[in-house]
Each structure stands twice: as C-alpha cells, then as structure tokens.
C-alpha cells in the first residue's frame, strides 16, 4: 500500500478566519495554527467562533505538536479553548509566543502548557515530521512559513504573507530558502489566498509612514490614530512620525496596551525617547502636541475609539478639529459597524481620514504577482489553496494553472476534507467532522444551531408569554390567561390584540378536557402555543417566540 500524506483543513476554507490545518503522516499528526473568527451579525450573544476539533480530540494521542505561523487572532484566538481539550506542545517564534502567553495567563494555562520558541531558519523534530521555520513578511512581526519535511516529501505551508522589499524591521522574506526548497523538490504547496483577486503587488508597509508624516505635519490639532493592535510596525511608524513632529503619544485600549508592553519588552518596538506619556496626562498638553493611538479600527462596540465616538470614554472626548486617522481597512462583515463610528466622529466635528481618502493602510497579504513568485520558486508537484472564500480558492486554482500546474494536481477542499497525497496522485478521500463551535462567555460549544435559531427569532420578532392559571384538582382555568410580550408590540397601544390573544388562548385551553388538563401540561402547552402562533402570524405576519407557562394552583 502506497504511503499517504493527509492534509486536513479544519478551518479557513470557504471563509475568512479560524485558520487551522492538520497534517497526518505515518500515523502521526501535527497541527498548523488555531484561530478564531468574528461572529456574524446574526450570531446574537456570541463572542467568537472557533473550529470544531472533534477529529483532533479523538486522535489526540497521535498529535505531536501545534505550530503557529504568526500572532493574529485568526491564527491563535482558539488556542486556550482547544488546549483545555487537547494538551499539546506549541511551537512558534518569540513575538508570537509573547502574545500566546497573554492568552494562557488569562485562562490559567501557563503551567500546563509547553510553549517552545523557535527562530526563523531553525527546525523542530516532531515525531515523523521535521518542521522548518522560514521568515516571511506580514502585518505582524515574527511571521513564518513552514517547510514540513517527511520521508514522502516536503510541504510548504505559507501562512499569511506578502513580499515586502522595504520592511520596517529590515527583515525581508526568505525567498532564497523557498527557492532552495523548490530545487530540492516540493511535494505540495499550501498557500494563502486572501488577496488572490488583486493584481500586481501589495505595497510596502513603509509607504504608510510617509502618509503619517504628511498628515502630522499638516495638522495643528490633536491626532487620534486607530489601527490593528497587532500591527507593531504600523504603531512604530506612528511613534516615529510623532517624535519627528514634536508630539507626545498616549495609548488607550486594552489590546493596544498589551501589545505595546509585549513588543517593547521583547525588543520588537523601539519607542523614541520622551515620546510616550500616560493617557491621563496627555490632555494637559497643547492639542498640537498630542497623538493618541487606540483600538477600534473595526468599530467594535467596547473598543476605545467606539467609546470616544459615543462619549463614553473616561479620558478622551472627541471635539471639533480633532483629526482621526483610521489606518486599517474594514474586515469583511465589519463595514456597517465601522461606518457607524465614522459617522458619529463626523457628527462630533472631527476630521476623519480613512483608507479611501489616502494611503493609510496596506494589506499584509500577497497579491497575484507575489503569489506567482512563490509558485515559481517552490515549483510544487501538488497545490492546495488555503485561507479564503470559495471564489478566492477558485481564482488561486486558476493562477496555479496559469503557472503550468495540472488541474488534477490541485485540490480545492472544504473544512473537514481529507486531502490524500501519494508520490504520484492527489485526491479528496472523504471527510472528518469540522464546522463551527460558538464561544458565549465562559461557555464553549454549548450554544448550538437550535439556540442560535431561537436567538435570531427573538431578535427579529420578539416573544409572547402566555401564563395559564390551572386548578390542580380538576384542571379548570381559574382566570383569563396573562399575556406578556417583549420586543413584539407596544402593549399600551395594542389593547384589542392583547384581549383577542387571551380569547384565543382560552379557546385552545377549553379544547383540552378538564381531566387531561389536570394531568398533562405538555398537551395544554402545545395546543395554546399552536393556536396563539397561528393567530399572530395570520393577523400580524410576524412569528414571535410563543412560550406557554402553566401555573398550578
């Protein structure tokens, strides 16, 4: 029987976020990345979404390690939740380890977790796998791709990347090593598809610094900059521009404060001397000497920028003349919330500069020409497009064919697909359990499809509670039912409807004989629920959640 290497995406396909891929060879497994996704607008009460790791739980004795490409939430956000079910060592670069450690501390997992830091250019032996760390450029420091070596051959897993010839930290992507791997022979390439729809090259991060200088030099008022907290190089450029323009910088927002602490302690950010001040002290400076760096680039409701916009931030109040710079583009799905914050900032008299107006943000993902370079350098026998929605995966497949690949050597899978590679062929050989697990407060996985459906229904049509006072002995209805509504109608203006609902509920209850009413609450509740629901839809064309409550007296 021919040897097989299995590639099993558990997240990140046909979606943006919750990236996770398992590699299986010789009866052993390694996992690459462990990310979360933001909940959709219809996921009421959900904090985040993580991959379903049922397959990994069933096979946890075969797992040899979790390897992390970089420290973005869509690659590390699920780690604490998964570690509570699967104890496995984590291998990552130093900066990524610093961010993961914050999560482990928050979940009291530091002592029970083996966290190993690995430098780019080094390799780790994990059972029958040898995983080589290769430096790449991305919108967060210390990002890597992996060359996953097995006796069958080498898989190059790019993670998120771009080709930046002028990176802020001076560390360019290791194209030389990728080229060497191509010469040695790459069995399969698994590559980022996020920006495959965009032609050309992604601009260098350094271009944003020039924009900051121009915006700072042409402003005599306070400047507030919001960006992704994880983009250390972006924040570094804000600090540098502020220092050159004689301004002080204060930081607000929990994730931004944590990121500043980790990046400065580990040496990934260098704060110009006498530039950083406490957020409580900066308001004592002249407006033209102030810069505030904040979270909230995605319009998150509890973020610092959101609270500034809606006048609930304790230290910062937006006023006329303030210049607010949004140095980030909205993640797909967040456009409405970002727009709401921008509108409120304008309403308060601020000047808002955002991506459409200037070169204030550049992507951290490779565009078409960069992807072609990676394909040309690695010369893979097989190809699996990762990290993207269906159209992105399909376009990446077309790009690979333009580079000369045989369509039969390309696999476009779904989350849970088992992509099997032998030395000569590739196929999707079945699937494993995969999907979404909802995190709601401290609950993980206890909110399923039925609960989400009920929450959606409550949010859209409200709730009607019908309280039925029933005599315990003979089942007689002791009084007219009490009707309680929430989120359905304004009761004071709907007296006729409320009276009619009482009659409908009484008629339904009367349809159940007294003897049955005295013994069977279930049948009574079912009859009342059906009658009230039908009446409401017929007369209002709405379907609130109807909850009959039987009270025995």
Residue ranges and their predicted role:
Residues 2-67, 72-284, 303-317, 336-340:
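His/Asp/Glu-rich metal-coordinating catalytic cores
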Residues 13, 37-45, 62-63, 354-357, ...:
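A glycine- and charged-residue-rich anion-binding loop/surface
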Residues 15, 140, 286, 458-460, ...:
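Solvent-exposed loop and beta-edge segments used for protein-protein assembly and interaction
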Residues 89, 384, 547-548:
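Short glycine-rich phosphate-binding loop at a beta-alpha junction
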Residues 104, 400, 536:
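Conserved hydrophobic residues forming the short capping helix/wall of the S-adenosyl-L-methionine
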Residues 119, 414, 542-546:
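Short Gly/Ser/Thr- and Asp/Glu-enriched loop/turn motifs at secondary-structure junctions
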Residues 197-327, 331-356, 360-500, 504-516, ...:
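Hard-cation-handling environments
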Residues 517-553:
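C-terminal tails and terminal domains of large nucleic-acid-associated
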């Amino acid at each position: 029987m021919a040897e097989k290497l299995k590639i099993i995406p558990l997240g990140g396909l046909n979606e943006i976020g919750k990236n996770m891929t398992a590699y299986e060879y010789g009866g052993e497994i390694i996992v690459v990345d462990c990310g979360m996704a933001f909940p959709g607008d219809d996921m009421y009460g959900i904090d985040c979404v993580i991959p379903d790791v049922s397959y990994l739980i069933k096979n946890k004795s075969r797992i040899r390690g979790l390897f992390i490409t970089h420290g973005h939430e869509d690659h590390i956000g699920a780690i604490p939740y998964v570690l509570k079910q699967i104890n496995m060592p984590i291998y990552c670069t130093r900066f990524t380890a610093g961010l993961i450690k914050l999560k482990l501390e928050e979940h009291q997992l530091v002592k029970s977790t083996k966290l190993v830091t690995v430098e780019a250019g080094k390799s780790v032996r994990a059972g029958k796998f040898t995983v080589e760390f290769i430096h790449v450029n991305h919108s967060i420091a210390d990002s890597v791709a992996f060359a996953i070596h097995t006796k069958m051959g080498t898989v190059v897993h790019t993670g998120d990347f771009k080709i930046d010839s002028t990176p802020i930290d001076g560390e360019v992507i290791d194209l030389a090593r990728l080229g060497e791997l191509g010469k040695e022979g790459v069995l399969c390439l698994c590559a980022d598809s996020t920006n495959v729809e965009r032609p050309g090259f992604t601009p260098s991060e350094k271009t944003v610094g020039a924009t900051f200088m121009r915006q700072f030099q042409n402003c005599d008022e306070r400047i507030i900059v919001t960006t992704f907290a994880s983009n250390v190089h972006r924040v570094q450029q804000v600090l540098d521009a502020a220092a050159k323009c004689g301004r002080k910088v204060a930081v607000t927002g929990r994730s931004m404060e944590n990121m500043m602490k980790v990046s400065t302690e580990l040496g990934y950010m260098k704060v110009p001397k006498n530039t950083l001040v406490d957020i409580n002290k900066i308001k004592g400076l002249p407006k033209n000497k102030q810069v505030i760096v904040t979270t909230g680039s995605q319009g998150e409701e509890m973020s610092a920028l959101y609270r500034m916009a809606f006048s609930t931030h304790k230290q910062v109040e937006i006023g006329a003349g303030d210049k607010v710079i949004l140095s980030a583009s909205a993640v797909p799905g967040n456009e409405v919330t970002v727009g709401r914050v921008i509108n409120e900032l304008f309403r308060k008299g601020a000047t808002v500069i955002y991506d459409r107006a200037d070169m204030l943000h550049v992507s951290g993902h490779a565009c078409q020409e960069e992807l072609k370079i990676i394909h040309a350098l690695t010369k893979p026998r097989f190809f699996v497009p990762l990290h993207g929605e269906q159209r992105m995966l399909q376009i990446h497949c077309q790009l690979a064919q333009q580079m000369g690949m045989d369509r039969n050597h390309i696999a476009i899978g779904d989350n849970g697909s088992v992509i099997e590679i032998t030395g000569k062929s590739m196929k999707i050989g079945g699937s494993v359990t995969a999907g979404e697990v909802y995190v709601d407060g401290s609950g993980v996985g206890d909110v399923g499809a039925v609960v989400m459906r009920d929450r959606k229904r409550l949010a859209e049509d409200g709730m009607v509670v019908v309280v039925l006072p029933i005599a315990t002995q003979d089942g007689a209805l002791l009084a007219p039912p009490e009707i309680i509504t929430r989120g359905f109608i304004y009761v004071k203006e709907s007296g006729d409807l409320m009276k009619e609902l009482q009659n409908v509920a009484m008629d339904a209850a009367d349809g159940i004989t007294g003897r049955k009413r005295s013994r069977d609450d279930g049948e009574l509740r079912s009859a009342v629920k059906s009658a009230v629901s039908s009446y409401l839809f017929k007369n209002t064309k709405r379907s609130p959640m109807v909850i009959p409550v039987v009270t025995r007296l």
